[in-house]
Amino acid sequence: MKALTTRQKEVFDLIRDHITQTGMPPTRAEIASRLGFRSPNAAEEHLKALARKGAIEIVSGASRGIRLMIEEESGLPLIGRVAAGEPLLATQHIESHYQVDPALFKPHADFLLRVSGMSMKDIGIMDGDLLAVHKTQDACNGQVVVARIDDDVTVKRLKRQGNIVELLPENSEFDPIVVDLRQQELTIEGLAVGVIRNGNWL
């Protein structure tokens, strides 16, 4: 594949992220809206350029007729540092892929998150571990979730009562995080479904 310009890379990343999150490519109108193009025609020109460079295939007669031609890396993506306001699974956040069968976890894992800190050590989630996460916004009280509070991503046990959410640590040395949903934004990014142990303690 020929090298992409910065703008073409933005379009390509948007297509790939949209497929990752929704299971389908975006329409021309969605690309134009997300990237600030004046019209879907401008998006179409970028798509044609990507097709000429071998990055995508345009399927005629369909508003979502875009197929990625670059082979995706297999395995579960490992999410690194997350930029503010961007999707957790955006391409730029993926550090690498691990050859782990998602079906080993119930429900299945969609991605891995490297644990930072010891706030959940009492249930065996240690600093440096890889946390297997099932991507969902639905979570019940008592479940261990990956939550985003403003710009920060954290792993805690969920407790919600009305507009007040407590994110509880599993380590008495740490305090709960209390979020008033009327004043602060909180997003559930997924459920913890398993742990791959960091081997440094061996």
UniProtKB/Swiss-Prot annotation:
Statement: the UniProt record of this protein carries the keyword DNA-binding: yes
Active site: S119, K156
Key words of the record: Autocatalytic cleavage, DNA damage, DNA repair, DNA replication, DNA-binding, Hydrolase, Repressor, SOS response, Transcription, Transcription regulation
InterPro entries, sorted: LexA, LexA-like, LexA/Signal_pep-like_sf, LexA_DNA-bd_dom, LexA_repressor, Peptidase_S24_LexA, Peptidase_S24_S26A/B/C, WH-like_DNA-bd_sf
Residues annotated as site: Cleavage: A84, G85
SUPFAM superfamilies: LexA/Signal peptidase (SSF51306), Winged helix' DNA-binding domain (SSF46785)
DNA-binding region: 28-48
Catalytic reaction equation(s): Hydrolysis of Ala-|-Gly bond in repressor LexA
MF terms in GO: DNA binding; serine-type endopeptidase activity
Annotated GO biological process: DNA repair; DNA replication; negative regulation of DNA-templated transcription; proteolysis; SOS response
CDD domains: S24_LexA-like
Enzyme Commission code: 3.4.21.88
Catalytic EC class: hydrolase
Function: Represses a number of genes involved in the response to DNA damage (SOS response), including recA and lexA. Binds to the 16 bp palindromic sequence 5'-CTGTATATATATACAG-3'. In the presence of single-stranded DNA, RecA interacts with LexA causing an autocatalytic cleavage which disrupts the DNA-binding part of LexA, leading to derepression of the SOS regulon and eventually DNA repair.
Subunit and interaction comment: Homodimer.
Family: Belongs to the peptidase S24 family.
Protein name stated in the entry: LexA repressor
